Every structure is written in structure tokens, then in C-alpha cells.
């Protein structure tokens, strides 16, 4: 478990980008930019850069989950690019 400097907000929740395009939010959710689009409907969830003092507690399990999600999203993006 580690406290990490928040890098973004997602719908008002502090979040940290722990892998390319993958975030752990302060509410414990793991999101990628692709899943934020899916769950946010047509407009997507609002992801904003954050430069304040806030931190997010990230467990080893959530870090691993975000890294896997990042890899899956990258693979999907490569597959779509081939079509």
C-alpha cells in the first residue's frame, strides 16, 4: 500500500495515473481512458489534470489491476488500428 501524488480528477474524485492511460481513483476504482468513455456514456467521464497536494492510496492489488487494464487497452487499440 502506498500514498501516491494525485495526477488527475475523474468526475471529481482524485486519481493517479499508474500505467499508461490507466488510473486508480481515491474511491478504489480502476479505470482506463477507454472504460471511462464506456461508463460515462457518449461523452465519457470527465478526466482532468490535477496539480494540487492531494494523494491517493494505492494497494499492490489495485496497481497490478491497473497495469493489466493498461495492457489490455493497448492491445485493443492495436487491434482496432489494424482494421
Curated annotation (Swiss-Prot):
The gene is 3. It comes from Mycobacterium phage L5. This is Gene 3 protein.
Amino acid at each position: 500500500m502506498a500514498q501516491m501524488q494525485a495526477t488527475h480528477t475523474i468526475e471529481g474524485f482524485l486519481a493517479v495515473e499508474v500505467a499508461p492511460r490507466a488510473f486508480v481513483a481515491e474511491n478504489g476504482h480502476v479505470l482506463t481512458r477507454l472504460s471511462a468513455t464506456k461508463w460515462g456514456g457518449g461523452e465519457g467521464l470527465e478526466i482532468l489534470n490535477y496539480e494540487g497536494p492531494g494523494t491517493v492510496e494505492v494497494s499492490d492489488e489495485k496497481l497490478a489491476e491497473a497495469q493489466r487494464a493498461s495492457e489490455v487497452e493497448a492491445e485493443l487499440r492495436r487491434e482496432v488500428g489494424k482494421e
